[in-house]
Design a protein with these regions (language model features):
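Conserved pre-ATP/AMP-binding loop-to-beta segment of ANL
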Residues: 24-27, 150-168, 174-175, 180, ...
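Conserved AMP-binding/adenylate-forming core of the ANL superfamily
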Residues: 29-79, 83, 100-103, 107, ...
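Structural core segment of the AMP-binding/adenylate-forming
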Residues: 87-151, 156, 261-262, 267
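Conserved AMP-binding/adenylation subdomain of ANL enzymes
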Residues: 187-204, 214-256, 271-275
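Gly/Ser/Thr-rich phosphate-binding loop
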Residues: 255-259, 271-348, 361, 370
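Conserved ATP-binding/catalytic segment of the ANL
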Residues: 360-361, 368-376, 380-443
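C-terminal boundary motif of the adenylate-forming
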Residues: 417-419, 454-485, 513-514
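Conserved C-terminal "lid"/linker of ANL adenylate-forming enzymes
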Residues: 464, 468-469, 479-480, 501-548
């Protein structure tokens, strides 16, 4: 069902109400246990009723117009709380607590966004540290103990330009920032995704992506609400413990729409043997999207090859490009379109630029000259779209320079900070602007250096790596941190480091000043699994990494 004609001037609650009127008993969300059986199912009616009951309590607490942060484990509690906050006329801010040490950063975020309430289940509330409990003017609400009456809920008056929710960036290159997502932003982005994926109500979604992550929240909670697609959820913990559970859920429930970052596809290839793959029927999977991090041509090709025996079709692969500042989705391309550069490295197209459509409008701009680049010329990716947020929540200082950049006589562009180029109307992303390493008049991408290292050492004792530049008394120095995967002895990895040094010297042609092998899980990552390059640099300079 297409709703693109209604995405302008609407709000998310109006969409929810129309979905309720049209298909109240339709199953919308099903939650799976570890054995992949359905343990809980929500129709549109049940979802609305439980969210309205909680919203009535939140209204009684005086939260209208306030920010309410959410910290939940996987499950239905988050979805109900998220919708309830919006229905109460407040603004939800999903947060993540993966480890006990995350509470400090959560406390900083609560202060930053001025949260008036923290919504949590009792299991989380019981572990709250004093740093959270002593925050001034913060109500901690145990939502599983609140008894509300849906009949007491009063619908708030919402405008399409109002803040719908606050989506925090991943924090891979800087501290997480809260992006101010309006109702118009989210409905327009849902329309873009529905169009790109050609969604129909008969489609079935399957996801393990965390709800605090924009791909999980928007792609598998709000897009299903928009399009009527029934979605099955398994937990990220279950996927991490047994990657096959993701594909088993797709096969069992005939999932047609599912996806994840590149690392998840790589993990499936590593952990699922050919014999096990032969037992799966993935012929139903028509949209296998991949985004959130750089898409590897090698990973995509290996996944398609491994699961061909499962009936998986290579054309189902859909590399995507997006970011929180543009709500989520910017572009996508069905199938693998690969461009081999002169140096032999391969880039994957993450979008076909349809010249017949003016939203989103994507331009490649020279960071030095501020002019649009020619075909194949690398520059910063600029985006203009109704999906682009108005700015960062309560952080106006940089909004104009980031969210309203000028190109000749045209304004309103988002400067993504990503580098890329266009070739034959295909968009290719090559790295981050701030991750460019310059030597002898040449520019190198940290992502390319890491990719070259992983091509040699992945599966050979190295789980992941991060490269960054340092300024030293002797000049700039490239550092490469290599994280053990715990399956192979460190001595065997050390023996291959000279080969890696030589390989990087010849391709791409840069000298690594320092290589350090660090213990398993030592490298800092974001809540969505992205490596934190700046934090890695800080830890290295502070001597916090023990070497093996």
């Amino acid at each position: 069902m297409s709703r693109s004609h209604r995405s302008s001037g609407w709000d998310l609650l109006s969409l929810f109400e129309e979905r309720l009127e049209e298909s109240a008993e339709m199953p919308l969300f099903s939650y799976l246990g570890r054995n992949m059986d359905v343990r809980e199912q929500y129709s549109v009616q049940r979802l609305h009723s439980e969210a309205a009951a909680l919203a009535a309590v939140l209204q009684a607490q005086g939260l209208k117009g306030s920010v309410a942060a959410l910290v939940y484990p996987p499950g239905s509690g988050f979805v109900i709380a998220f919708l309830a906050v919006i229905m109460a006329g407040a603004r939800p801010a999903p947060l993540c607590r993966a480890r006990s040490r995350d509470w400090h950063s959560i406390a900083l975020t609560l202060r930053q966004c001025g949260a008036a309430a923290l919504l949590v289940p009792s299991a989380v509330a019981d572990s709250l540290p004093a740093e959270i409990l002593t925050l001034r003017a913060l109500q901690v609400l145990r939502t599983d103990t609140l008894q509300g009456d849906a009949a007491q809920w009063r619908r708030p008056v919402l405008a399409s330009t109002d803040t719908c929710f606050i989506q925090f960036t991943s924090g891979s290159t800087r501290s997480p920032r809260g992006v101010d997502i309006s109702h118009d932003n989210i409905l327009h982005n849902c329309a873009l995704i529905a169009r790109a994926f050609a969604l129909e109500e008969k489609d079935v979604g399957v996801s393990w992506l965390p709800f605090h992550h924009d791909m999980g929240l928007i792609g598998h909670v709000l897009v299903p609400l928009y399009s009527g697609v029934h979605n099955y959820f398994l937990s990220a913990r279950d996927f991490a413990a047994r990657p096959a559970s993701w594909l088993e859920a797709i096969a069992r429930y005939r999932g047609s729409i599912s996806g994840a970052p590149d690392f998840a596809y790589a993990l499936c290839v590593e952990r699922i043997a050919q014999e096990q793959a032969a037992l799966l029927d993935l012929s139903c999977w028509r949209v296998a999207y991949c985004g959130s991090e750089r898409v590897s041509a090698s990973t995509m090709a290996r996944f398609a090859q491994r699961f061909a025996v499962s009936g998986f079709m290579p054309d189902s692969l859909m590399p995507c490009y997006g970011m929180a500042e543009a709500t989520l989705f910017i572009s996508a391309r069905r199938g693998l379109q690969i461009h081999e550069r002169d140096d032999g490295r391969c880039d994957v197209s993450v979008g076909y630029l349809d010249v017949q459509r003016d939203d989103p409008c994507i331009r490649i701009v020279s960071p030095q000259e501020g002019a649009e680049c020619a075909q194949r010329e690398e520059g910063e990716i600029w985006v203009k779209s109704r999906s682009v947020a108005r700015g960062y929540f309560q952080d106006d200082a940089i909004d104009a320079s980031v969210f309203n950049a000028w190109l000749e006589h045209d304004s309103g562009y988002l400067r993504t900070g990503d580098l890329g180029y266009v070739l034959d109307d295909n968009l290719y992303v090559t790295g981050r602007l701030k991750n460019v390493i310059k030597r002898r008049g040449r520019s190198f991408h940290a992502e390319d250096i890491e990719g070259e290292a992983m091509t040699l050492l992945h599966g050979q004792g190295v789980a992941r790596c991060v490269a960054f530049d340092l300024e030293t008394q002797g000049g700039p120095a490239l550092v490469l941190l290599l994280e053990l995967d715990g399956q192979i002895e460190a001595e065997r990895v050390h023996a291959r480091l000279p080969e890696l040094q030589t390989r990087l010297w010849y391709t791409p042609g840069i000298l690594v000043s320092r290589m350090l092998l660090v213990p398993e899980r030592a490298l800092p990552v974001t809540t969505s699994g992205k490596l934190q390059r700046d934090r890695s640099r800080e830890c290295f300079l502070a001597g916090e990494f023990s070497h093996v």
